[in-house]
């Protein structure tokens, strides 16, 4: 009888707490004036710099508007008041994880190079990721 009542109370408590989300879906800003509401317009030089650094093509207006929305979202996060909020921790922070021993398997270079799409002088050839993109006309910003 006692065990049944304890399990009922436990399930009732868990059910009542699980219906409310612990982490809010959107950032909570205590000072709405500092939220930075409004639209953010990026200059063409900024878009060119971000395109060159990230190697992402912002060639149309939709891509630039997505970038502006991301910057706006990040500016809202920067204005969130975190005073008095303790940093999050993980239960695995101080735990030594026991991993299995690595067993090295010997295989020939011919077997390994069978996985490569392009081979040059017995080396894998990967597509270059650091070639700068050519600048576009105005990136859909409307201003020149």
From Swiss-Prot:
<feature type="transit peptide" description="Mitochondrion">
    <location>
        <begin position="1"/>
        <end position="17"/>
    </location>
</feature>
<comment type="subunit">
    <text>Subunit of the heterotrimeric GatCAB amidotransferase (AdT) complex, composed of A, B and C subunits.</text>
</comment>
<keyword id="KW-0496">Mitochondrion</keyword>
<dbReference type="Pfam" id="PF02686">
    <property type="entry name" value="GatC"/>
</dbReference>
<keyword id="KW-0648">Protein biosynthesis</keyword>
<keyword id="KW-0809">Transit peptide</keyword>
<keyword id="KW-0067">ATP-binding</keyword>
<keyword id="KW-0547">Nucleotide-binding</keyword>
<dbReference type="GO" id="GO:0030956">
    <property type="term" value="C:glutamyl-tRNA(Gln) amidotransferase complex"/>
</dbReference>
<keyword id="KW-0436">Ligase</keyword>
<dbReference type="GO" id="GO:0005524">
    <property type="term" value="F:ATP binding"/>
</dbReference>
<comment type="function">
    <text>Allows the formation of correctly charged Gln-tRNA(Gln) through the transamidation of misacylated Glu-tRNA(Gln) in the mitochondria. The reaction takes place in the presence of glutamine and ATP through an activated gamma-phospho-Glu-tRNA(Gln).</text>
</comment>
<dbReference type="InterPro" id="IPR036113">
    <property type="entry name" value="Asp/Glu-ADT_sf_sub_c"/>
</dbReference>
<dbReference type="GO" id="GO:0005739">
    <property type="term" value="C:mitochondrion"/>
</dbReference>
<dbReference type="GO" id="GO:0070681">
    <property type="term" value="P:glutaminyl-tRNAGln biosynthesis via transamidation"/>
</dbReference>
<dbReference type="GO" id="GO:0006450">
    <property type="term" value="P:regulation of translational fidelity"/>
</dbReference>
<dbReference type="GO" id="GO:0050567">
    <property type="term" value="F:glutaminyl-tRNA synthase (glutamine-hydrolyzing) activity"/>
</dbReference>
<dbReference type="InterPro" id="IPR003837">
    <property type="entry name" value="GatC"/>
</dbReference>
<protein>
    <recommendedName>
        <fullName>Glutamyl-tRNA(Gln) amidotransferase subunit C, mitochondrial</fullName>
        <ecNumber>6.3.5.-</ecNumber>
    </recommendedName>
</protein>
<comment type="similarity">
    <text>Belongs to the GatC family.</text>
</comment>
<dbReference type="GO" id="GO:0032543">
    <property type="term" value="P:mitochondrial translation"/>
</dbReference>
């Amino acid at each position: 009888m006692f065990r049944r009542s304890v399990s009922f109370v436990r399930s009732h408590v868990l059910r009542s707490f699980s219906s409310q989300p612990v982490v809010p879906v959107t950032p909570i800003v205590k000072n709405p004036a500092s939220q930075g509401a409004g639209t953010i317009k990026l200059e063409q030089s900024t878009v060119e710099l971000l395109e060159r650094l990230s190697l992402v093509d912002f060639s149309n207006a939709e891509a630039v508007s997505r970038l502006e929305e991301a910057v706006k979202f990040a500016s809202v996060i920067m204005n969130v008041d975190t005073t008095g909020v303790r940093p999050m921790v993980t239960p695995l922070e101080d735990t030594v994880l026991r991993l299995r021993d690595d067993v090295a398997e010997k295989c020939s270079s011919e077997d390994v190079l069978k996985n490569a799409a392009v081979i040059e002088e017995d080396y894998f050839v990967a597509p270059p990721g650091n070639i700068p993109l050519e600048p576009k006309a105005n990136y859909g910003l409307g201003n020149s």
